[in-house]
Structures are given as C-alpha cells and as structure tokens.
Amino acid sequence: MQESRRHFLAASAFALPALSTAIQAQSTPSRRPKLKITDIRTAEIRGHGYQVHVRIYTDQGIYGHGEATDSAQGAVPLIQGFRRFLIGQDPLNIEAIWERIRTGGIFAGAQGGQYVTALTGIEIALWDLAGKALGLPIYQLMGGKVRDKIRVYCDSANHHPDDPQAKAKLKEIETMGFTALKFDIDEANDAARFDRMNWTASNGEIDRMVKEVAFVRESVSKKVDVAVDMHGRYDATTGKRVAIELEPFRLMWLEEPVPAENVDVMRDIRQATKTPICCGENLFLRHGFREVLEKRAVDIIMPDIQKCGGLLEARKIADMAHVYNIPFAPHCVVSPVGYMASCHVCAAVPNFMVLEWHWISRLKLWKEFVKEGEIIEKGFVTVPDRPGIGVEMNEEAAKTAQVPNTSWFRPGV
C-alpha cells in the first residue's frame, strides 16, 4: 500500500507540470492580427446589370473585396459617406460595424434600397478581409459547410417557340451540365396586351405564356428542372390564373407573379395553386422577409445576397426560413467575385436549394473575370478552401466592363 502511494506521488510530480502547461495554453487568449481600416475604394462595372465592387484596406496591407448589385447605381456616394463608420475600426468586428451603419441611417433610408445595397458591398468586403486575416474560408467563419458543391441553375431570359435558335440554346444549357434553368414569361410588348399600364393579362397573353412554358419543357429532358419568372408585373387575378394554368408542367417555381410588397396577395396565389411560388429578390434585410415567412406566402425564398444586407444577413434570413421548412434559393446576377461569396453562404445553410447564374450571354467575361478562371463545372460550384472568398479579380479583364467616367479603386481622401 505504501509502495503504491509512493508510485502515485512520483507519477503526479511528473504529470502536474505538463497539466499546468496545458491549462495555461488553454487559458491564453487567442492571438489574432490587430488590424485597422485605412481606406475604402470602389469600382463600377456593367456585367449582367450594374455592380459596385468595394475594397476595404487595412494598415497591415490586407484588403477585402465585396460586391453589390441592382440598386447599386447611386450607391458609391453612400459607400464613401460610410467612411466615418469605418476608418480606424477593427475590420473583424463585422457585426458592430454593420449595425452602426444600419442604425446610423434610420432616417436616411436604411430600411432598404440603395442604402442597404451600399451596406451589403461593405459587409461582404469585411468578410473577405476577415477570412484572409484569419487564414480561413468564409464558410468556416459561418459555422462550417454542410455541402462541398453548390447546385446552379442557368437563367436564360426568353425562349420563344418561333425563334429557330431557341431549342438549340436550351439544349446547349443542358449539355453544359445544368440540371435546372429559368426563363422569363413577362413581356411588355406582347401583341395581345391592350394597355401597358393595366397589369391584368389578356387571354392571348396567358396563352402565349403557357405556349412558351410547354416549348421549354419539351425542349429539355425531364431531369432538368424549369422555373419561370414574371418579375412582379401582373395583378392578383393574372397571377392566380397563370399559376393554375402552369400546374401540369410541375415547375420548380413561379417567381413573383405579383409585386412582392403585397404579402396577402402572394399568399392567396400560393394557397390557390399547386405550382410553387417564389419571391425575395426585391426584399431587404430580415425584416423584409418576416411577414412573408410568418404568413407562409411563398414556398421558396430567394434573397439577393448582394443587396439584401450581406452574407451574415442572408444566413440569418435562411435560418428564419428553415424554421418554416422553406428552402433558400438566392437570386444572383453578379460577377464571379460576388457569386463565390454567395456560394459560401449556400455551403453553410442546411436549407439551400439552388443558386441562380445569369451570365450565359457574357461567357468570355465570366470566365476571365477572376484569376482562378471558370468556377462553374457541369452545373455546380465547388466551394474553395482558400482564405476569404477564395477568388481574386482579374483587373485586366474586369476593366473591360468598367462603367465609363467612373473611378477604378481610387484612394479615398
């Protein structure tokens, strides 16, 4: 017994220093780079639509790159006005910076539109910067990834049965490996439209829509999902009629049959049809999605990550939708820089469904826009493990799409 006690004490004498070292190592604060924001710069590009690229620079030579879209025209003065919230700040305090900018504009339109679009570009740049500073991909900073590859659908605008090239174009999309596509069925210049100010479609317009959907559905194989977009350009009566008439085609979704701001009408259409209803590209922040989700007005939500408030805000919107068992299928029309940023969110949320791609008519620019080259392979994006967003702009290619008479990442005052 005495011998066992001596053995225990001797072993403890050797073990205690090691244990003490381990405890000390665990209690030592983690070391991270001490950074301060020194500048914010912008560039304006016309890709599919109008995009503002944002770079946030630091005193350690690291910069982050973000991208905002759609209501980006007019966002640059707002972004420069936000310098007062940014210069001298620690860029890793993303939530604090985001909230200061948002609450600082409560009386200046911070509920949506250009203000939130400008904030979005900044927020995405901060996430890219944080990932680079910490040596981690953005998805890892958002809790890790639940998938390695992101399913992509090709938005291909219009497909008229009388266009001799239409069927070949659709087949090309399928040959490229896409398992889903979307096209538009709203048409302001429809010959059957009697009054451009009246949002009630005539029988002729609805017949034309049904004919186009039938043509597309027959032109691709059954394994390719088909969605259609009405861009919120019709009234409640038309939206309901179209949704019901398209039921036999088993669409992936019908997008914005009516304007998104009337949630009750959207809900009425959803309840009247088997066709899945989708909206969200024109909503901003979590607050814009709350009523849509609470009233179960849609089957699928599609926030635009480059204008809804940013990566973390999109993650929060997806999490809200997940509570209601509603899938998350983001709208996305941006360059490969913003596109890959969106992919990090899609990789991190369980209820992701599919991500839009709208550059099929700009393939050369798309493939050359980032140094890494093409990021979509056979209808999927593999999320990179590189720090931050994981792709870098090829400025020589990107400059070919620069908006005339705008600056190119010019240093601030």
Tell me what each language-model feature is:
Residues 389-413:
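Extended hydrophobic packing segments that form well-structured cores
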Residues 123-159:
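Glycine-rich, aromatic-flanked loop segments that form ligand/cofactor-binding clefts
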Residues 37, 61, 122, 135, ...:
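Conserved, mostly hydrophobic/aromatic
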Residues 62-134:
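Metal- or metallocofactor-binding catalytic centers and their adjacent structured scaffolds
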Residues 76-77, 84, 89, 96, ...:
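Shared catalytic-loop signature of beta/alpha-barrel
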Residues 19-48, 54-56:
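C-terminal segment of N-terminal export signals and the immediately downstream linker at the start
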Residues 149-272:
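Metal-dependent enolase-superfamily TIM-barrel catalytic cores that perform enediolate-based chemistry
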Residues 1-16:
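N-terminal secretory signal peptides and thylakoid transit peptides that target proteins
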